[in-house]
């Protein structure tokens, strides 16, 4: 806060004239800039991490599905054992000795059809793929969670620079007005209220600059003129994205597919064990001869209860729970998005109004400039400075409105899990 002492009228007027000339030059030669773009996307590190994670999940799925494809159900079992009692019983005749054996070797090749790729192989491969896809999507959601905050920070930082430069120019105006009011106060030509009002505005402007541009030098910057714009929203594409393409929707769809696939795998036949087999046995008989024999058959295990219908009903209920949860989530998201869309619409209107006000004020200042120059008896310098300050305030308000609109767009993109640049939002100049 500047406090002036021993002010002279000529010095105050000279400062006004210098500032008016400076403002006229700046306003007639502004630096036109486009509104900052929302850079909502994955940076190189994000993209590399996600590509690596995706490739690992796909490799894991390929290996696990290959394991399913190689599971042909063939099983080899064998046994080797001896019968010690054959050595101790020596009083039996030769026929009895021939019917006994000292040792036995047996090998069996069985085909466990139910627990193989030949029975519901497609569903078994799908189970592997869906489980990995669910884990991949959930991991991707975690990996992309911070891009919205980063996009909001980047957008805010860009706007803060332009807002800060406008405030800095307004602060220069307030410094001169403060100087004039102090001079007038010394001469008892003004009330304290007007001076206090300017001093409070100066304090507020200085505070805003310290918050918005604490790490930037915004002194002696040009006036940046931002072209006003309107944001159009493709609501049909937005609703379609919420229903089908958002990462949350895809996660819920995969969960539903998992429940549906598990329902197909749940059946009575899947709980049985049916194993055709071929067996070869060799006996070392008690008369020291070797005998062989082979046989074929079917070994089966059949539960006397059937819990599959209950499990399928449980899975169908789970599917309904998933659908209900998804519908509830979508409804809540759409309600939040509708509020943000209404906010964007209101901000579009406010920006258009402020842009019109800037245009009209600029024309007014141009007309008044010639009027002031032609007034030989002088004019109200404070009133003229108020006109310039009003224009700067209007520019500041418009930039803040455009920033708030950009943040509303990012909030929508966060709510519906858009994590890359898209064509849902289109910005056009007014």
Located regions from the model:
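Amphipathic alpha-helical coiled-coil scaffold segments and their short linker/junction regions
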Residues: 6, 28-73, 192, 216-278, ...
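A subset of solvent-exposed loop/turn segments in beta-rich extracellular surface proteins, enriched
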Residues: 8, 12-38, 81-138, 174-180, ...
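Amphipathic alpha-helical coiled-coil segments and their boundaries
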Residues: 9, 39-49, 53, 121-128, ...
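A glycine-/polar-enriched beta->alpha junction
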Residues: 43-49, 55-77, 83-127, 140-144, ...
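Outer-membrane pore/translocation modules
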Residues: 113-117, 121-124, 138, 142, ...
């Amino acid at each position: 806060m500047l406090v002036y002492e021993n002010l002279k009228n000529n010095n105050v007027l000279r400062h006004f004239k210098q500032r008016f000339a400076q403002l006229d030059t700046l306003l007639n030669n502004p630096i036109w800039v486009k509104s900052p773009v929302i850079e909502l996307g994955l940076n190189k590190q994000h993209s590399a991490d996600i590509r690596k994670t995706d490739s690992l999940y796909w490799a894991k799925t390929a290996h696990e599905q290959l394991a399913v494809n190689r599971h042909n159900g063939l099983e080899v079992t064998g046994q080797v054992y001896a019968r010690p009692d054959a050595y101790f019983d020596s009083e039996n005749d030769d026929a009895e000795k021939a019917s006994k054996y000292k040792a036995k070797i047996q090998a069996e090749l069985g085909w466990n059809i139910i627990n193989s790729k030949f029975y519901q192989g497609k569903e078994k491969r799908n189970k592997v793929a869906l489980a990995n896809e669910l884990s991949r999507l959930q991991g991707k959601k975690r990996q992309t969670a911070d891009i919205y905050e980063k996009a909001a920070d980047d957008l805010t930082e860009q706007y803060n620079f332009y807002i800060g430069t406008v405030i800095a120019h307004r602060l220069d105006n307030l410094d001169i007005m403060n100087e004039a009011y102090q001079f007038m106060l010394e001469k008892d030509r003004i009330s304290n209220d007007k001076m206090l009002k300017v001093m409070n505005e100066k304090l507020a402007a200085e505070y805003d600059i310290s918050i918005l541009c604490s790490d930037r030098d915004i002194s002696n910057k040009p006036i940046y003129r931002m072209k006003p714009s309107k944001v159009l929203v493709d609501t049909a594409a937005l609703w379609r994205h919420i229903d089908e393409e958002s990462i949350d929707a895809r996660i819920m769809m995969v969960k539903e597919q998992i429940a549906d696939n598990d329902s197909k795998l749940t059946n009575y036949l899947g709980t049985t064990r049916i194993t055709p087999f071929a067996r070869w046995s060799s006996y070392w008989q008690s008369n020291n001869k070797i005998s062989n024999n082979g046989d074929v058959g079917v070994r089966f295990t059949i539960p006397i209860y059937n819990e599959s219908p209950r499990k399928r009903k449980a899975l169908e209920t789970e599917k309904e729970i998933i659908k209900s949860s998804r519908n509830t989530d979508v409804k809540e998201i759409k309600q939040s998005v509708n509020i943000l869309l209404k906010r964007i619409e209101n901000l579009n209107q406010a920006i258009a109004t402020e842009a019109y006000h800037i245009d009209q004020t600029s024309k007014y200042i141009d007309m008044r400039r010639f009027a002031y120059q032609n007034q030989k008896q002088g004019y109200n310098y404070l009133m003229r400075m108020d006109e310039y300050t009003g224009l700067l305030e209007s520019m500041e308000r418009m930039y803040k409105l455009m920033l708030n609109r950009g943040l509303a767009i990012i909030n929508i993109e966060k709510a519906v899990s858009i994590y890359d640049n898209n064509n849902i939002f289109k910005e056009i100049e007014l």
